[in-house]
């Protein structure tokens, strides 16, 4: 899914599910805060469901306590399916984005940027 956006995971990153079926929501929120404070790119799966409609917004609000609202983010819906869609947006826009269980969300770090319309987290190599 990440390749649909460009190269958002080309440095350290963390993956988390927003499903609270097996993990309490309070623990998930604690982990999201730690991830945001670590300045790692985040990959979020199970971002929303009918029962958890507000979890992605709440997760974004937690991240915005640490990172600016214009942090580069992205989403890919229906990865590998005929109706696959992907987009790049800001953290503030992501907070209001209507994700579903078929969506994977990516929140960039302080180095993530948009290059030629793609979400890119550089590894620090210099082009010579």
Model features per residue range: what roles?
Residues 1-41:
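Class I SAM-dependent methyltransferase SAM-binding "motif I" and its flanking Rossmann-like core
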Residues 37-128:
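A contiguous loop/helix-start segment that scaffolds small-molecule binding in enzyme catalytic cores
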């Amino acid at each position: 899914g990440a390749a649909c956006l460009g190269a958002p995971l080309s440095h350290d990153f963390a993956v988390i599910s927003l499903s609270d079926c097996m993990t309490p929501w309070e623990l998930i929120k604690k982990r999201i805060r730690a991830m945001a404070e670590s300045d790692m790119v985040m990959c979020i799966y199970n971002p929303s469901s009918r029962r958890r409609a507000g979890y992605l917004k709440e997760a974004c609000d937690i991240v915005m306590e640490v990172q600016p609202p214009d942090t580069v983010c992205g989403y890919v819906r229906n990865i590998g399916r005929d109706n696959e869609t992907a987009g790049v947006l800001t953290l503030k826009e992501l907070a209001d984005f209507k994700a579903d269980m078929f969506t994977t969300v990516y929140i960039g770090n302080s180095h993530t940027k948009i290059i030629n319309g793609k979400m890119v987290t550089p590894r620090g190599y210099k082009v010579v």
